[in-house]
Amino acid sequence: MRAKKSYGQHFLINESLAGSIVKKALAVDPDLPILEVGPGKGVLTKYLIESGREWKAVEADRDMIAYLSNNYDIAEGQLISADFLKVKLEEVFNGKPFILLGNFPYNISSQIIFRAMKYQDLIPSVIGMFQKEVADRIIAPHGSKTYGAISVLNQVYYTGKTIFKVSPGSFNPPPKVQSSVIHLTRQLSLPESVKLSTFRTVVKSAFGQRRKMLRNTLKPFIKETSLLESGLFSKRPEQLSVQDYIQLTIDIQNQIE
């Protein structure tokens, strides 16, 4: 069965790596079930089955659902035929937290991360395969060239590290780029006083013109011009840490309230 470009499919064929990825997920917390996104032909799924851990998988491609059902011993309800971005995650394990795992479809991998952020109360850990460029941006430290809006927004909720670097030959068909598996671990989220919508707007606006100083890009949000004299506003977006962006949002909120 061939991979479909419309689903961003690149099937992982490196068995040793597949086993190692699942082993990492199983080690996070023995009491948590695992939700796999985009199981494809089941290279990760079979190790989940062997583990005896409670698990489910979300697959948008109905042909893959049929393939998995015909080739593996899978109980009714373990395969969810749906677009992951539309699944009500609070219903998957009846409100129970879970580990998010997958060789994520490259065409929606960033959206998967944003969805994990939205449901961070349910998802204490993410272990996923990404294009290396995307993975690097998700976990990039401030001050680096790859640090951007997705870095800041993710790191409010999760700390991250690369656990495997993966060459194109580990897939069929091989992608044209390198890949990475990263492990995200939940940390403290935004302070209750910070409005998520305002925080996102500030971060995305700041990086919308990353070569400009923040006093220029964020000027439309400022009513009290004295605030622009703050040291944070004299910097460019990549120079600010996550905590700096939280403080920036608080400052902007305070002048409105």
Identify the residue ranges that each predicted region occupies:
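Catalytic cores of RNA-modifying enzymes
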Residues: 1-205, 243-250, 257
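C-terminal lobe and adjacent flexible extensions of AdoMet/dcAdoMet transferase-like proteins
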Residues: 186, 203-257
